[in-house]
Amino acid sequence: MGKIIGIDLGTTNSCVAIMEGGEPVVIQNAEGGRTTPSIIGFTSDGGRVVGQPAKNQMVTNPEHTIYSIKRFIGSRFNELTGEAKKVPYKIVPQGDDVRVEVEGKLYSTQEISAFILQKMKKTAEDYLGEAVTEAVITVPAYFNDAQRQATKDAGKIAGLDVKRIINEPTAASLAFGFNKDSKREKIIAVYDLGGGTFDISILELGDGVFEVKSTNGDTHLGGDDFDARIVQWLEQGFKSDTGIDLGNDRMALQRLREAAEKAKIALSSSASTEINLPFITADANGPKHLQRTLSRSEFEKMTDDLFERTKEPCRKALKDAGISADRIDEILLVGGSTRMPKVAHVIKDVFGKEGSKGVNPDEAVAIGAAIQGGILGGDVKDVLLLDVTPLSLGIETMGGVFTPLISRNTTIPTRKSQVFSTAADGQTAVSIHVLQGERGMANQNRTLGNFDLVGIPPAPRGVPQIEVTFDIDANGIVHVSAKDLGTGKEQHIRIESSSGLSESEIDRMVKEAEANAESDKREREKIEARNVADSLIYQTEKTLKEAGDGVNAADRARIDEAIAELKTVLSGDDVASIKAKTEILQQASYKIAEEMYKRQAAAGAAAGKKSDAPSGNEAEGGDVDYEVVKDEDSK
């Protein structure tokens, strides 16, 4: 069995870790980063880039750069509540489902997420030097069944067998408590404010057991929302100053978003920050520049309601766990957004104590996922993880009432059954409407699925015995069955992702991903070859300029010709030609370097001989060096 990697699939950034020698290790990506931006860029020539290269094209190609896809995964189109209008790329419906449209092609949210997971998979494979096929992937604790299933599907499309879906706060607690020799039970809270989601979990740790007591959160609250407030402030200020509305200029908006994120980060360590965006737009009078100063107090004022929104889930989680705030031993801060200083005030207000920086907020979740992978793979012993389901599960009963079978914060895996009956005389079939949520009426909760149990013998209302069983696995994914106890007839359903991907669609996407792996590799090779060539041209031209007359005319002509030929092939896509012409220029540039080195060595030798000749004072027998030392000593 190969290694099981741990992946934190984040809204803003993703991270991958592995267990090595009994310890979790965060793996650097090809760009040298320990985290990878969760961004996919589609290039003009039909290529695709992921991570930092995609982030680099956000301003110049906003419509084809996909970010924060986690906010949409597992959602129906009618559930997006205006969020689709806040991104520069195109979100469109396909039936009830959400799709991303790029150059006329539709992508599911799972496919987009799979591109990020493929990047994390490749990062791990490059590090390990072997194929990786198994992973533990994290999700926000408050993700519903559809979002969990969609994340699992994304893993499958990326070529990964997802061994476990684990809640992010739970993973962070594993990172915190792993290898800590503590027999004393400890109660911790994990306050996880990421790029797009917020979770709070209350856990009990002790003697290798990590037991989640309760969880709560908001899957539409995170760093993106804080950035959006700064963007709004910049837009309004610029319109007030110039009369120009930047809201319809996608490129300008993307520059505002980038500047907003940088300003937010700067305000975590500074009392104020300058936002300078030259040439943000232009009118009949010429180019316009944006320059504003944002203070931390102003930022905290404009986002106060967002910070406040994190308090109520914390209080609910404490109440559900039956634990008072003063019994919490430690509050772990997880997610990059917890670096905002105002978070410390929120923590103090709710829990009455300071938050702990006992884990790296950007890496703890991936580390915990790797530890979970180690547990599943048998590399980590004596650790037991007991997680919970975040939302109640049940069915619709007569009168449109929601009847829960499994209450929220029930430890998983779990199985619960309840017997129901028919609502009308002679009824031969029942429709089972499966829901998830906390509201009293069925139509106020989220539909997970519908199925029918048919073939019930006609009988008076209330006589047939229909046993409905809910089964939640360790991933938090729901399976439901209904059985007529009189006839033994049974109907099963595994609740599929609400994104509507069938098994055949997932298989098709897996095959597409495998087919594209080769073209992606070719695209990477092309980009790398171009980068090497561009760098060599720049360096060679710089060397020629510095050398001046030091390079003879014949050598210079040969190098100029090699540069011209390389520039010509760079205008095409033939990687072999680019590499061949790069090699020719490389050899020619080596010759210049060799000649220059010889010249410098000869000049150095000549200078050495000159310095070996006696100076005027030495020729006269003067004792200059000795006199200087004496002068220093006498001071």
Swiss-Prot record:
Region (Disordered) location: 601-635
Modified residues (Phosphothreonine): T197
One Pfam family, short name: HSP70
Gene Ontology MF term list: ATP binding; ATP-dependent protein folding chaperone; unfolded protein binding
Keyword set, alphabetical order: ATP-binding, Chaperone, Nucleotide-binding, Phosphoprotein, Stress response
Up-regulation conditions: By stress conditions e.g. heat shock.
Family, per entry: Belongs to the heat shock protein 70 family.
Reported function: Acts as a chaperone.
This protein's name: Chaperone protein DnaK
Organism from which the protein derives: Treponema pallidum (strain Nichols)
